């Protein structure tokens, strides 16, 4: 059962999916549109698509999406002209990408609230989510709406000289059509929006060309976090709902029982069961499970009948209209928590670990250590934006998130690493070329301090006679093994160096785990305990299976270590403690 719960959580937390559109795919979205408002509520059609984005005005598009207009912009044409927006004939390109489908999904609890709520509740949910969607698309336009200028053709290199190569140019906004859908392929409430972004944008030089799609892909996860943050704020403001903890970028409405969420998550259950039966895990396996269990989506769906069935299923679980009404009646919107930009009133996520108010610098240090660099020593501006958006109170507007990011990057706690000018830059409205800091990587001052302490300890542990074995016993073990010449040399080096920490580096498949098996043999024969450590449970199992070493995860080791007095494994870094064990760390990079 626990494995199914994990699969359910993993399958439900993709808040923003991004796909390249195929030629002619717009027919799928247009076919699901209802003929009118009455059919939307009583029949099977979905809401009509609506134009979004700063680029639609340049094409004279507004309001509801007309099928002919959508077909035109996805083909790279201006509506009703048969020509490109530049007034030219479209050049045929066999691999042209019509656009991108940005699919924004809400947490299952929000879909359940929409599916079981009355018309007023449904309207409030849709209104709040669409406000968040518009805010997120605006953020994406500021951060990831670019066209390319220049050329990478080798034949033009001498002609163009220093101007050779492509550069990003700021565009005037996306040409996008938003379609709202209410159900999953399994017939459960699943509120989501398909935002079809045409591969067409106008640069600030006035010329219409294809988008720089790589920028959108880079910003995808951060945009998903921005959407979830804005959605929580909007639904709290409209309906007074409170939220549970944020896990994997998403949070559910507090008060809706887990059994109800599971009942209306048939797709997630199907995916989890497929993974369980296949014995697989990870993103690639999840993608395979999604495709393997995918049903053909019904276009003609009786939404009124579905609503009746949803209410019956919820009633059977003891969570009907009375419980929903009580949830909305007793949930009160919390007052805004302190996050004033120019004052020392920072609280945010720190309230989860302390009750005291803190200054911005202390708050930022906590955020960097606990949320940003806990699993990766370097981060980008987008990574920092995700952490700040997910940590500040639900009432925080996006402008405050962006201002907080800028203040954090200017803080002494954040250290840029690498070259500011490694990218060719972005052409802005002033026609000046400025650096693109989206790809710039940063680290934290506190992490550099930890690194400096670690390096000092490593230096102090060089050639101190720790773990040195009798060369004859080592040679005997090598002779009785199937090690190659380079593996045998690694065993000699590791058992004869005398350093507190010794490192063996090799590509995947070069036999590092097999070499560890021989190290286990010689060290155990010399009276040492040999224990393996790995960053994940899967890596620990592979280390144990391949080397015969009893292995665990680094996280589990740290928990167990903290309960020991003194922690026995710290002899590696504490010269005064006995060298009675050998700890082998596998796949740590």
Segments (PLM) and residue ranges:
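ASCE P-loop NTPase motor cores of helicases and related translocases
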Residues: 279-287, 291-383, 387-577
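Glycine-rich, phosphate-binding/catalytic loops in enzymes
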Residues: 549, 587-589
């Amino acid at each position: 059962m626990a494995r199914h719960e994990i699969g359910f959580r993993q399958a439900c937390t993709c808040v923003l999916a991004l796909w390249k559109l195929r030629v002619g795919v717009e027919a799928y979205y247009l076919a699901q549109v209802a003929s009118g408002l009455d059919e939307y509520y009583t029949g099977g059609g979905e809401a009509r698509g609506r134009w979004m984005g700063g680029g639609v005005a340049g094409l004279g598009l507004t309001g509801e999406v007309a099928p002919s207009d959508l077909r035109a912009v996805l083909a790279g044409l201006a509506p009703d002209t048969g020509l490109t927006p530049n007034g030219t004939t479209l050049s045929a390109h066999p691999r042209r990408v019509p656009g991108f489908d940005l699919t924004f999904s809400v947490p299952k609890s929000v879909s359940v609230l929409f599916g079981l709520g009355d018309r007023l509740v449904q309207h409030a949910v849709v209104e709040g989510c669409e406000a968040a969607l518009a805010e997120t698309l605006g953020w994406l336009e500021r951060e990831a709406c670019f066209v390319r200028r220049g050329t990478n053709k080798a034949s033009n290199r001498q002609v163009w000289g220093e101007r050779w190569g492509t550069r990003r140019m700021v565009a005037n906004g996306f040409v996008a059509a938003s379609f709202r859908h209410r159900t999953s392929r399994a017939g459960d409430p699943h509120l989501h929006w398909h935002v079809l972004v045409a591969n067409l944008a106008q640069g600030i030089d006035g010329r219409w060309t294809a988008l720089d799609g790589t920028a959108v892909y880079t910003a995808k996860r951060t945009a998903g976090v921005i959407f979830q943050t804005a959605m929580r704020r909007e639904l709290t403001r409209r309906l007074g709902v409170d939220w549970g903890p944020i896990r994997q970028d998403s949070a559910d409405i507090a008060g809706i029982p887990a059994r109800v969420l599971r009942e209306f998550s048939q797709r997630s259950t199907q995916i989890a069961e497929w993974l369980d039966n296949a014995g697989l895990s990870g993103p690639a396996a999840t993608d395979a499970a999604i495709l393997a269990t995918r049903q053909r989506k019904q276009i003609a769906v009786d939404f009124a009948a579905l609503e009746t069935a949803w209410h019956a299923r919820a009633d059977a679980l003891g969570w009907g209209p009375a419980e929903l009404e009580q949830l909305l009646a007793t949930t009160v919107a919390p007052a805004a928590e302190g996050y004033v930009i120019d004052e020392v009133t920072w609280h945010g996520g720190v309230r989860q670990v302390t009750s005291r108010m803190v200054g911005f610098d202390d708050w930022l240090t906590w955020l960097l250590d606990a949320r940003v660099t806990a699993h990766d020593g370097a981060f980008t501006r987008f990574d920092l934006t995700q952490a700040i958006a997910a940590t500040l109170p639900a009432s925080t507007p996006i402008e405050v998130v962006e201002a907080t990011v800028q203040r954090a990057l200017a803080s002494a706690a954040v250290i840029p690493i690498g070259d500011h000018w490694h990218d060719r830059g972005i052409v802005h409205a002033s026609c000046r070329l400025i650096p693109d800091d989206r790809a710039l990587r940063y680290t934290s001052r506190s992490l550099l301090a930890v690194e400096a302490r670690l390096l000092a300890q490593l230096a102090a542990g060089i050639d101190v006679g720790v773990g040195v074995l009798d060369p004859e016993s080592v040679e005997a073990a090598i002779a009785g093994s199937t090690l190659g010449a380079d593996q045998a040399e690694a065993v000699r080096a590791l058992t004869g160096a005398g350093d507190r920490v010794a490192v063996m580096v090799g590509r995947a498949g070069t036999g590092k785990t097999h070499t560890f098996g021989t190290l286990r043999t010689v060290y155990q024969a010399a009276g040492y305990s040999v224990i393996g450590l790995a960053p994940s449970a899967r890596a620990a199992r592979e280390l144990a299976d391949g080397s015969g070493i009893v292995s665990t995860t680094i996280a589990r080791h740290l928990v167990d270590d903290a309960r020991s007095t003194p922690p026995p494994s710290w002899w590696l870094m504490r010269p005064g403690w006995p060298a009675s064990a050998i700890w082998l760390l596998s796949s740590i990079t």
